[in-house]
Amino acid sequence: MNKYHTLPASPEYITAGTVISRLLASIGFRYYWATDGLPETVATFQPENEARSIAENMAHIWDILQWVHAAIHPESVAKPEGLHPLRTGTLALIETLEHSFSTMDVQTLAEIKLLKQPFWPLINGPLSDVLTHIGQIAMLRRIAGFPVSNSDPFLGTPPPGK
């Protein structure tokens, strides 16, 4: 069972780092359930030729998170090949980012640069974008006739019976 099957416990203290860490935990939980049980046949679904497929959205989410990772870690992480390795690798990348941010103090956060911009665009840019794409995956699954399980993102609990 993956860490994001349920939303991890809230941090004991509120700091700048733990707030970003909690956002990443929420992303992990939502991504976990949006991609849970996704068959290859549904992953290629796209409502029209110009739209991204579910699998393409998953790859795009990986790219965005890898970009965030590169802003705080000098080493690069290779993109996994295949749908299920990509899902597992993305969840692992989210966990790495969550842990990294949870221990950062304000000074370290202030030193983060994304496209030569200070910390703030990290929230309204890539992390918000990831949430949008997770929502697109959920919507595309519903359109394809394979809706996501009914997890509870407010309480961070899995669907009944899972």
For each feature predicted by the language model, list its residue ranges.
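Helix-adjacent hinge/juxtasegments
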Residues: 67-100
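An acidic intrinsically disordered interaction segment
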Residues: 22-33, 90-100
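Short, contiguous alpha-helical
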Residues: 2-8, 21-32, 42-80, 115-162
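Extracellular-facing binding/remodeling surfaces
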Residues: 36-42, 103-104
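Second-shell loop/turn segments in exported
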Residues: 14-21, 80-84
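Short glycine/proline-rich turn/loop motifs
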Residues: 9-13
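Acidic catalytic patch
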Residues: 101-116
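Long, well-ordered core segments of solenoidal/helical folds
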Residues: 98-102, 160-162
